[in-house]
Swiss-Prot record:
Transmembrane regions: none
Protein name per Swiss-Prot or TrEMBL: DNA mismatch repair protein MutS
Gene Ontology terms describing biological process: mismatch repair
Keywords assigned by UniProt, alphabetized: ATP-binding, DNA damage, DNA repair, DNA-binding, Nucleotide-binding
Gene this chain is encoded by: mutS
Organism classification: Bacteria, Bacillati, Bacillota, Bacilli, Lactobacillales
Length: 867
């Protein structure tokens, strides 16, 4: 019977470390591999597709294990972290050759979803935010940082909804909380698939003091400390690149909740989840990674301050007016690497020689950028921007003098320091060079002396330098000339006392040279680290210029205009407006522009028309135009006069919230309620067919009540599309409501959508025409025509006037809709046809997707064709 394995010192050491990191995969360094054991090994082997083996396979309790080569470990770590796991990296802290007893090992870094430093391919323009939350009553302290750039923001928030909206907007993958945060709040984070990590209060550090020096609110101070302590605990190194925290209020920016950002497809397509087809995709003509990240931040947080908006507009206008200078700027920007993340790597201690060369190359472009701005600064639009463009010449000169332009990736293998930078290093290199010349001379000398022309001198790490002679030439070798060292299949290797003596000198010079190079490199790195703040300020300045030139490029390409924004007026006058993304996809020649005009007397447009005619596009067009305008960009229109909006609310589309278990209708009502309760007269509301997620009568009653409430109480500018045509009668009683519709005509039996917004309500829905195009049986269509004629002959009941008092019923429109389904005198048909006709009458064609409509038509055809 197999015996149980006695725990070895190594496994005891492993378990001791693992106990400190129970929620992480432990990558335990053994020689050239990172090994995983026990449950970690079983799970990792599945996630990483590794071969699962075992230590002591024949024992009663074999230990599951798997491993990865140390040089390939980063890829495996990335896979685990991308899936929401943590990885603790445990390194050997001493050379196994010189260690006495067990090799000392300790965790040097805990990699988590929120602390990833290495940018992945294609992710250069994305931030990776780690967030932190503390709670006190109904108040929350909230902070976030991107460890790769050092950016730090903090706020005090009084609503869980606002807190969640901030976290979802940041696309955070990890939040740090303490044990005082209520369980229902933690559960809300988990429900959004955010990893929750715990960090209770730790000691004040220099980093905590530096980061929080401009902050005074108690909750803000507490959450900064919690976040910085967590970073120090997980990263186990100096965090000198963390920037001073900037306090902000969500109310400082145009409020866009997560639902609005999704519905408007600002940064992610509803269909694919990718950037393509979004407003970010359209606007992104940035040349730098940091510019791309800043563009996304501006898009997520449009401005409210009119002066800031105008300042951006003025800079965009200057770039538009100076094409050649803008081209020169773009050329310089293409040679600027990611200054923010380079500075982060310098401070983090992970920078290498190539990174420093990229930093030098970037700094070389700054004088060129300054020259461009100085040349187009007639209106002083770039005065502030110029103050941020410090070329940091001392750092550039240091790198130019010290670092080899062709540096290797490794910082410990030599070849990183320039010749002439350090006298001692040059001496070592000369010794190495002379030694190698001596080896070449020895090889030539021995070939001539022995007559063996393929004799060669080689080197490996086991035997050092050797003389190699092929087996075929061994007979030509003078007896006793060399000392045999190694026998190979086809050759013999030899040494001589003279060769070993020279080897010692060469290797000693190489070893000392490599060690000195690393020491010199760290000195350079530390000198650069002292200028981190200057580099970060420069990076922000360059990023902002990159975004503004991107606005200019897009505005020129698509013939955008500078909008006029006002805070003393609520009027909207958008002439020949276009949906920017649809226009890019279709091409300007094919896109049909539409005006949006809402003067002092109009707060609400009630939009009617068939599905797929362009109602949703029209609504999104206005919202995207507002967002672009308040970002400081020009807008797609012939002219644009807009108010500065404080919030945009949308309910467009109907996707079930499967994660939280809420139905389409529940989500619809919650979003509508959020808009109604939070909107002000300075807000913009877009409601697309509210009420379609429930029974017809309930839906229309709710739609009418919502329209009346917004009209009477909220007074926000509102675009409300509906398939309840009866609601158009509300324009007779609601003074600030105006009807518009999407035009459609029949030409040669074909239904043609004009995609043009026209005044007044739609006069028909074209439902039977669509059914005909879908191939419905002729007898069924004739029956539908009969029913439609009878319904159209029925007198219309007027919509009851809306009142402010909520207890007053507003039933007329609902009664009218109910009357559509009262029994009619029908032409004689068989029961089967009558059943299908009844189903058609009750089918909500206007809210069905094309696929749903086709599937239903197919079912009806099957029923009618049965014999």
């Amino acid at each position: 019977m197999p015996q149980k394995t006695k725990e070895t010192p190594m496994m005891a050491q492993y378990q001791k470390v693992k106990d400190q990191y129970p929620d992480a995969f432990l990558f335990y360094r053994l020689g050239d591999f990172y090994e995983l054991f026990n449950d970690d090994a079983v799970k990792a082997s599945q996630l990483l597709e590794l071969t699962l083996t075992a230590r002591n396979k024949n024992a009663a309790d074999p230990i599951p294990m798997c491993g990865v080569p140390h040089h390939a470990a980063q890829n495996y770590i990335d896979i685990l972290v991308d899936q929401g796991y943590k990885v603790a990296i445990c390194e050997q802290m001493e050379d196994p050759k010189t260690a006495k007893g067990m090799v000392k090992r300790e965790v040097v870094q805990l990699v988590t979803p929120g602390t990833v430093m290495d940018e992945k391919a294609g992710h250069a323009k994305q931030n990776n935010y780690l967030t932190a939350v503390v709670a006190q009553g109904d108040q929350f302290g909230f902070a976030y940082t991107d460890l790769s750039t050092g950016e730090m923001k903090v706020s005090q928030i009084s609503s869980l909804d606002v807190l969640l909206n901030e976290m979802l907007s940041l696309q955070t993958k990890e939040v740090v909380v303490n044990h005082d945060v209520p369980s229902e709040v933690v559960q809300a984070f988990v429900q959004q698939q955010i990893l929750v990590s715990y960090q209770d209060e730790g000691a004040d550090t220099a980093e905590v003091s530096f980061v929080s020096q401009n902050i005074s609110q108690p909750l803000a101070l507490a959450v900064i400390k919690q976040l910085v302590v967590y970073l120090a605990t997980t990263q186990k190194r100096h965090l000198g690149h963390l920037q001073r925290a900037q306090a902000y209020e969500p109310s400082q920016y145009l409020k866009l909740d997560h639902s609005a950002k999704m519905n408007l497809e600002l940064t992610a397509s509803l269909r694919t989840g990718h950037k393509s087809g979004t407003l970010l995709w359209l606007l992104d003509e940035t040349k730098t990674a940091m510019g791309g990240r800043l563009l996304k931040q501006w898009l997520e947080r449009p401005l409210l301050d009119l002066n800031q908006i105008k300042n951006r507009q003025n800079q965009v206008a200057s770039f538009l007016q100076h094409y050649f200078e803008r081209t020169n700027l773009q050329e310089a920007l293409t040679k600027v690497y990611d200054l923010e993340r380079l500075a982060g790597r310098v401070a983090f201690g992970s920078v290498n020689g190539r990174d420093l060369i990229q930093l030098k190359t970037s700094l070389e472009q700054i004088p060129k950028i300054k020259d461009v701005l100085t040349g187009i600064n007639e209106t002083q639009a770039f005065d502030q921007a110029l103050t941020r463009l410090d070329p940091v010449d001392d750092v550039r000169t240091l790198i130019e003098t010290a670092i080899n332009p062709d540096s290797p990736i490794s910082v410990t293998d030599g070849g990183i320091i320039q010749d002439g930078y350090d006298e001692q290093l040059d001496q070592y290199r000369n010794a190495m060079s002379n030694g190698k010349q001596w080896l070449a001379q020895l090889e030539a000398q021995e070939r001539e002396a022995t007559g063996i022309h393929n004799l060669k001198i080689g080197f490996n790490r086991v035997f050092g330098y050797y003389i190699e002679v092929t087996r075929a030439n061994l007979s030509s070798l003078p007896e006793g000339r060399y000392e045999r060292k190694q026998t190979l299949t086809n050759a013999e290797r030899f040494i001589t006392p003279e060769l070993k003596e020279k080897e010692q000198l060469i290797l000693e010079a190489e070893e000392r040279s490599t060690a000195l190079e690393y020491e010199l490199f760290t000195q350079v790195r530390e000198q650069v680290k002292l200028q981190i703040e200057r580099l970060q300020t420069l990076a922000k300045g360059v990023a902002a210029l990159d975004v503004l030139q991107s606005f200019a490029v897009v505005s020129e390409s698509y013939h955008y205009v500078q909008p006029t924004l006002r805070t003393d007026s609520r009027e909207i006058d958008l002439v020949d407006g276009r949906h920017p993304v649809v226009e890019k996809v279709l091409g300007r020649q094919k896109y049909i522009p539409n005006a949006v005009q809402m003067g002092k007397e109009t707060d609400m447009l009630l939009i009617t028309g068939p599905n797929m005619s362009g109602k949703s596009t029209y609504m999104r067009q206005l919202a995207l135009t507002v967002i672009m305008a308040q970002m400081g960009c020009f807008v797609p229109a012939k002219s644009a006069n807009l108010p500065v909006f404080d919030q945009i609310f949308t309910r467009i589309g109907a996707a079930d919230d499967l994660i939280s278990g809420q139905s389409t209708f529940m989500v619809e009502m919650m979003e509508a309620n959020r808009a109604i309760m939070s909107a002000t007269a300075n807000s913009l509301i877009l409601f697309d067919e509210i009420g379609r997620g429930t029974a017809t009568y309930d839906g229309m009653a709710l739609a009418q009540a919502i329209i009346e409430y917004i009209h009477d109480h909220v007074h926000a500018k509102t675009l409300f599309s509906t398939h309840y045509h009866e609601l158009t009668a509300l324009a007779d009683t609601l003074t600030a409501l105006r009807n518009v519709h999407v035009g459609a005509v029949e030409e040669n039996g074909e239904l043609v959508f004009l995609h043009k917004m026209l005044a007044g309500p739609a006069d028909k829905s074209y439902g039977i025409h669509v059914a005909k195009l879908a191939g419905m049986p002729e007898t069924l269509l004739q029956r539908a025509d009969v029913i439609l004629g009878q319904l159209e002959d029925k007198p219309k009941a007027p919509v009851q006037p809306a009142t402010v008092a909520p207890a007053q019923p507003a039933a007329a429109a609902v009664e009218e809709q109910m009357a559509l389904f009262e029994p009619e005198v029908a032409a004689p048909v068989d029961k089967k046809t009558d059943k299908v006709v009844a189903a058609i009458k009750n089918f909500d064609l206007m809210s069905a997707t094309p696929l749903e409509a086709l599937n239903q038509l197919y079912e009806w055809q099957k029923q009618l064709n049965k014999h």
